[in-house]
Curated annotation (Swiss-Prot):
Location of the region described as Domain III in the Swiss-Prot/TrEMBL record: 153-201
UniProt record similarity statement: Belongs to the RuvA family.
InterPro entries linked to this entry: DNA_helicase_Holl-junc_RuvA_I, Hlx-hairpin-Hlx_DNA-bd_motif, NA-bd_OB-fold, RuvA, RuvA_2-like, RuvA_C, RuvA_C_sf
Gene that this sequence comes from: ruvA
Region (Domain I): 1-64
GO molecular function, one term: ATP binding
Protein keywords: Cytoplasm, DNA damage, DNA recombination, DNA repair, DNA-binding
Gene source species: Thioalkalivibrio sulfidiphilus (strain HL-EbGR7)
Domain of life per record: Bacteria
The keyword Amino-acid biosynthesis is annotated on this UniProt entry: no
Domain notes: Has three domains with a flexible linker between the domains II and III and assumes an 'L' shape. Domain III is highly mobile and contacts RuvB.
One Pfam family here: HHH_5
Protein name: Holliday junction branch migration complex subunit RuvA
Length: 201
């Protein structure tokens, strides 16, 4: 099991990033909350990782904090929630926002996330309510607010749309969400954050 990687950030395009660790390039999938904290390519990055083994592939997921990884690992144990959906949840809201939704039984906010229907949202509330108590305190206490600058993408609008599609949004819906906030930010990470925030209103 690969639990942590430290190396040079080679490239990033949500949800994928490439990390060079002593000459070996690791392709890693990460939630948008982690992308917000990444430096520009060439900077040093430490990621807490989870190796997900499937019949057809071994996929490495990376997280900015141990608490975020702990929440991911707990989410994929919920019936009907796979790694892709867990990544979409962590991309669509902070750990503290998710915790609040679960504790308050706020199904309405959860169904706004891509790929989550009412039954899945209700299952998340039921199954995660007890599990939250065993997770690191940071999951429920920290806001996980986006921070740190990242390199401006050559085409931030297209990158932002592609990122939303990879999270489960339909192409037309992703384009509509990004178009609505296009004039409010320049970096793809900021466009994505604003678009996702708008879906929760």
């Amino acid at each position: 099991m690969i639990g942590r990687l430290r190396g040079e950030l080679v490239s990033k395009q949500p949800p994928f990033l490439l990390l060079d660790v002593q000459g070996v390039g690791y392709e890693i999938e990460a939630p948008l909350s982690t992308f917000y904290d990444l430096p520009e390519p060439g900077g040093q990055v430490t990621l807490h990782t989870h190796l997900h083994v499937r019949e057809d592939a071994h996929v490495l997921y990376g997280f900015a904090s141990e608490s975020e990884r702990a929440l991911f690992r707990s989410l994929i144990k919920v019936t009907g929630v796979g790694a892709k959906m867990a990544l979409a949840i962590l991309s669509g809201m902070t750990a503290s926002e998710f915790s609040r939704c679960v504790m308050d039984g706020d199904v309405a906010s959860l169904v706004r996330l891509p790929g989550i229907g009412r039954k899945t949202a209700e299952r998340l509330v039921v199954e995660m309510r007890d599990r939250l108590g065993s997770l690191p305190a940071a999951v429920t206490l920290t806001g996980g607010k986006p921070a740190a600058a990242a390199a401006r993408a050559p085409d931030p609008v297209s990158d932002a749309v592609s990122a939303l599609v990879s999270l489960g949004y339909k192409p037309q819906e992703a384009s509509r969400l990004i178009s609505a906030v296009e004039g409010e930010a320049e970096r793809s990470e900021d466009l994505i954050r604003l678009a996702l925030k708008a879906t929760l209103k």
